[in-house]
């Protein structure tokens, strides 16, 4: 990996931190991972992100960059000669990738998270149905974007792969909680194969959270799930 003054403030369990880590690994950038403890904020985090006071924060040459998707953009541009391009080269393809990345964050993930916070069986059933519907849209988006290739971005992991793939660990935790498979060979065959390829990629595999550890963390984060 390339040697530079790079630090990343975050947590092993955060999907947003995962995005930054995958991008750094794709670009073969060495970095110091400064782990935050959930429920507390370090002085460095507050100093580096005084507006939102949230992780992740990438610190490159003492300059902080905040927000996960912005960090991924920055990594792709700052190290454009290292590793494959993360963002598509064509402006239209970049626009499509950004559209679906926003959909994942603003709609799809909200539905997934609502399964963990649902009050009662009926609310959970409604949340599961909504996730099913929105995941089918992502199946179609994958087929349209990939054009028969292994990833949304084509032959290698790119921006949209990172945007969705960073959620895979938590997605499996939600499947366990809901006792329901969302990635299913009969309903989303393309996404099933994509998820396997994504998790096996050398840039992802070493940092993907272990599911039992993540599930235990989720029980602490969402205590009502134990009821």
Curated annotation (Swiss-Prot):
Molecular-function GO term, any one: glutathione transferase activity
Domain of life: Eukaryota
CDD domains: GST_C_Tau (cd03185), GST_N_Tau (cd03058)
Compartments, record wording: Cytoplasm, Cytosol
Domain GST C-terminal residue range list: 90-221
Residues reported in the UniProt entry to bind glutathione: 14-15, 40-41, 54-55, 67-68
Domain GST N-terminal: 4-83
GO terms, biological process: glutathione metabolic process; toxin catabolic process
Record keyword RNA-binding present: no
Keyword terms, alphabetized: Cytoplasm, Detoxification, Transferase
Gene3D superfamilies linked: 1.20.1050.10, Glutaredoxin
Keyword Disulfide bond: no
Family under the similarity heading: Belongs to the GST superfamily. Tau family.
Function: May be involved in the conjugation of reduced glutathione to a wide number of exogenous and endogenous hydrophobic electrophiles and have a detoxification role against certain herbicides.
Name this polypeptide is given: Glutathione S-transferase U18
